[in-house]
Each structure stands twice: as C-alpha cells, then as structure tokens.
Amino acid sequence: MQPSMICFVLFLSVVLVTGCAAPSFEDRIDDLLTPYQSPQPGLAMRLVRGEQVVIERTIGLAELDSLQTVGATTNFRLASITKHLTALAILMLIEDRRLTLDTRLNAILPQFPEYAERISIQHLLQHQSGLPDYEPLVPLDRQPRIRDQGVVNLLQEVSELSFEPGTSYHYSNSGYALLAVIVETITGQAFETFLEERIFNPSKMSQSVAFVQGQNEIPNRAIGYTVGDAEIIETDQSDYSAVLGDGGVYSSIADLTTWHRVGFGRALISGRLFKAMMTPALERYGFGWRIDQFEGQTRYHHSGSASGFRNFIAHFPDIDLTLMLLTNRAGPDVLPIGEEILRIYFEQESI
C-alpha cells in the first residue's frame, strides 16, 4: 500500500473512532443545562468533592434588563434550602442551654391556644406539629408582605390542629416561620442578625444574607422569573417572600462551597446535635434536611421552590461530595436535573 494511502486510512480510522466516541462527562452535563443558556434566566451549578471542584457551570442571565450574567458569586433566593439554616440556629440555642428539643411551644410563645403545650421544638423541626400551612390564611390584599411575626399572629388564631403532634408528618412552612420567631424571642436579636453573626460570619460566607427589604442588601442579586411560551415575566417576590425562617436566605455557589468545606455547620454544634439533625424521622425528614439513600450512598438533600426560583442541594457524607444547583426561574423542577448530574458522575467514577 502506498504511504499516502496508509495515511488516509489512518486518518479515516481516527475520524470514525472519534465520531463514535461516547459523549464526555462535561458534554453530558452541558446537554442537561441547555435550557438555561442566554438570553434566558440562568443557573449556577457546582459539584464539589472534598476540596476539589469537580465541575462548575454558570450560565444564562441573573437579570434580564441589564443582561447581567450569572457567576459563582451570584446570589439566588434559596427558598426552602434555608430551612437547614433555621434548624441550625435552633440547635445552637440548644447548645447554649437556652432550649431543648422537648421545649414546648407555649413555654416560649404563651399566646397560643392550649394545644401549644403538646407541640415541641422537635415537632416543629420535623413537620410533625399539626399546625396548618400559613399561606392560605394570609389575606389576599395584605400589605406590606407578611413576615415571620405576622405568621405567628395568624397561627395563634388557629383553634385546632390537623393531627396530634408527633403522630404524623405534613410538610409545612409554618413551623419554620415559628422557629425564626423563637430564635428572636429567646435571643432578643433579629433573626437575620443572628444568622449573620452566629453562622455566616464565623463560616466566612460573605455573600449570604437573610434579606429584609429596607434593612440590608443582596450583593450580586439574581432576579426571579417565570418563563412562558411567549414571554418571560419577572416574578421575583410573592406575598410570602418576606418570611425568613422558611425560605428567606440568599446565597451563591461560592458561599455554599465554603459551607460544604466547613461541614454544613458541624463545628457550630456538638456531634450529638449534628447527628440528631441528620437522623431521619417520619418521611425521612431530619432537621431541615431530607435523609435517604441515592445510588447506594447516604444522602442529605433539600429542594427549594419560591416565586421565580428553583434550587437543589445534595450532600453525600461518606464520600464528601456536594452538588449545588441554583436557578432564577420558576421552572422546570431542578431535582430531576440534579439527580441526573449525580448519576452521570457516579457512573464516571464507578461509585
């Protein structure tokens, strides 16, 4: 065979092999995230193992009018991912011997009806209080937006519980709004100040903030949107967006990486309390975290859904792996996307 023909055959072989090669790990991830490309509302995703960033993607727009792009320090509303921070604040007060898991609601907020003597702090943490969701109780024309104390005012008018505390599970934002007010009542500090001074500052989470309109600012803020068939509508705030305890913290993948590296607050409380936080009860819910098995690995995780935002975080303690996925659009649900990212990674690493 002529040398030129040999070269051609070798070249053709390389082309064929390359063309048939399976998509790379990063290509498969990028395919999943295609809907978030500019000029759409965007996404910040980071997968971290130990000290190493395995993969990071920041795509799309944080704010459409200014065409501000999403970056690692872009702050998204965490929505219900906030709950583990509220739970941690309560556990820190238990560490300070100012509360116990068995402390009753009426011992702190005596204005509640008699049933409050049967509701414990642990019931509130694990959605077992029997209190109803507060959202349907909020008047439609209420101004200004309801805050945590306003939730307390509504709930104390509830005459009976949905079920006996501790006997059933009903996911509810009400308990976590109450927990924020309990922190304020016991400490005399605003909840946002407690989080800043006791959690964010010691943990070097410089971007994170529990947002209170007119009192603090959100650096590098992402605005929330709803993407329709014909238009994109700003839906950044709802009637419930001023409630802090159930979903009012803003943070970034940069700060959540720092949070991963300091063990999600492990150093701020005793090992006994951290273990209690991560112990599943009814419906496998701990204190602000869901605990289950995923692909054979223990997983702590939570989703967050608020007006204009959908988020997901998952931590695998046995392999020190954390996925954080933050978006500033009302849909789609990012839980399936996050779990597919994890499956792709586990497949690559043979985990």
List where the protein language model places each region.
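Bacterial N-terminal signal peptides that target proteins for export
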Residues: 1-8
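C-terminal motif of bacterial Sec signal peptides marking the signal peptidase cleavage site
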Residues: 18-19
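Extracytoplasmic/secreted proteins, especially bacterial periplasmic and envelope-associated proteins
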Residues: 24, 28-32, 80, 85, ...
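Short, conserved catalytic-motif segment at the N-terminal edge
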Residues: 25-76, 100, 159, 297
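Short active-site loop at a secondary-structure junction
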Residues: 36-44, 66-123, 163-174, 244-247, ...
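Short, surface-exposed loop or secondary-structure junction motifs
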Residues: 63, 116-307
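Short, gly/Ser/Thr-rich active-site loops of penicillin-recognizing serine hydrolases
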Residues: 295, 329-351
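Short, well-ordered beta-strand elements
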Residues: 301-302, 312-329
